[in-house]
Amino acid sequence: MLEIKLPVSILREDKKYIAYTPVLDLSTSGKDYKEAKSRFEEIVDIFFEELVKKGTLGEVLQDLGWKRARTKWVPPMVISQESQTVEVPIS
């Protein structure tokens, strides 16, 4: 078993909660915060199980920006998460 710290954003959209991690480009939802977090753990487990089963773990993680450090995989570091106001050409 490998333990990895993943950055996770929890968003609320109407009555659903969305859990998203940019380092795996993976998301899931739940009816509340707790369910979104629980489902996130499940989807990460499934994601890694499938990569190992298919033999594509290294390839996919490299494509997502992960680096191999000896016997471990290290995710890219999220250095900022913030709200930014932008103007879009929609009237």
Spell out what each predicted region is:
Residues 1-6, 38-91:
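Short, charged, surface-exposed hinge/linker loops at domain edges
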Residues 4-23:
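Short aromatic-glycine-(Arg/Gly/Cys) micro-motifs in beta-strand/loop hairpins
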Residues 24-35:
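A short, exposed loop/beta-hairpin motif centered on an aromatic-Gly-Thr core
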Residues 21, 27, 43-47:
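Generic alpha-helical hydrophobic packing signal
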Residues 18-21, 34, 48-49:
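Compositionally biased, intrinsically disordered low-complexity regions enriched in proline and serine
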